[in-house]
Amino acid sequence: MPTILYNTNSSLITKYRRPNASNQYKGFLSKKGHTRLNSKSSGDIWEKDCSHTKNSGNDVSFESEFEKDSVEYLRDLCFSIYPNSLHQKIRSIEALPDLQVNTFIALIFQNFVKSWYGIKIPTDDSKFLTELYNLVQDLITYLKSSKINYHALLLDYIPCLLSSHLKALNDSSQNNDLVYEQYCKLTLYDSKRYPMLFTEIIQSKMSTKSLLQRSFLDSFLNELVFGHIFNSIAEPYYLLEGLNKICIRIKLNSAGNTRNEVTHGKPKCDPWLFVSNVKHKILQMTRLLAYSTSTEAANMNTAEIQETAFLQRYIFTFFTDDFFKLSMRKPFLFSICRTLQHWISKLNALNRVMYRTFDNIVQTKITSPVTIGNLFSLLRHSLFPNDNMMGPPRVLPVGDAFLEFREECISNLWDVCMTYKLDHILAIKRSDIADLIICISKNRDCNKLLIYRIIDCVIAQLP
């Protein structure tokens, strides 16, 4: 990678002449350093010097002769950002999901990398952008070719992290100033290792020896990606908003089914409705049979199928013991679940069917190219509404407005529990719903640390 030129009279150089932020955080970070990364101090270059991305008045929609979000449109968008030397490589990118991923990352580079050259740094260094592009392609290729043990990741490790997360939030202080500190102690995790652990891994893949470029990449990752962007993702409001939308959709579907029953009179006496229900059940059984008999995905690591019974995975303990607390609320139901778990685990044929069903659900619903492509398209539309500059930050409710929204979420989730009779089956009370909602919306930094821990767990699963 080349050593880029810069203007020695620029006021930004004093910021870049400070020691590389990653160097002072080898191993564990100091509390002072962690606070600096999480606060909007006067030295935050991404808060001050990238203010052009927040000016929606200058945000002009990207123009293309092709339909928006089409393959040709996305390639045109990448062409407008990356240098000509990369256009041939971009043409060879697969449509799903590589092109969606590259388009999203290209817009980030345009807003926070490319905009520096010629304005803040008086040079047009296309080689640095090319190096970043190649790094992204290497990462995508590596992830696609990696054989991940989804059994351990989704059925053991992530449920275990969620369990410790909820327990720590429940046991932590109600004082917002002390929640994060107590949360770290209760989970036995030192947050000072994040996000520098990930930054050092990424920087180790770069071939540059330029201190300016390393400082730039260090600030880009620590203060923008793992700072502002991750802060937005970890906001409790977005979690509650997503949960609230799911509850509202369930309530609307339930209300629609109720209206249909009223319209048709007695549904049990309607032969057409009976035939429709039978067809629906047959389709469900056919889909389940297809999941359980289809071939396994190429990137699925199934080495532990014979070692651990499917129902012995921690996710079932998480739901029965940690989340619903059946041992205290419904001891008889809990004993039935444990008995069934014990006897079904002894049936090897049934275990193979359950594992194969799980593998195919993961392949078709979670890791499929369509799902990943849609996820990055959604992120692109949210952050870059005009496929140009980053949109203005969303104004989140605070104070009484947030408390009112939280109460609405509690009411909607309780209505869903009432709809499915979970208050009788699992002995759930409205106060339990309120405690759960208050718990998960207690602290943004705790949610952010959970995301870091999950990413760390995923990295550990990679070869």
UniProtKB/Swiss-Prot annotation:
It comes from the Eukaryota. One of its GO terms (molecular function) is phosphatidylinositol-3-phosphate binding. InterPro entries: Phox_assoc. GO terms for biological process: vacuole-ER tethering. One of its GO terms (cellular component) is nucleus-vacuole junction. Present with 259 molecules/cell in log phase SD medium. This is Uncharacterized protein YDR179W-A. It comes from Saccharomyces cerevisiae (strain ATCC 204508 / S288c) (Baker's yeast). The lineage of its organism: Eukaryota, Fungi, Dikarya, Ascomycota, Saccharomycotina.
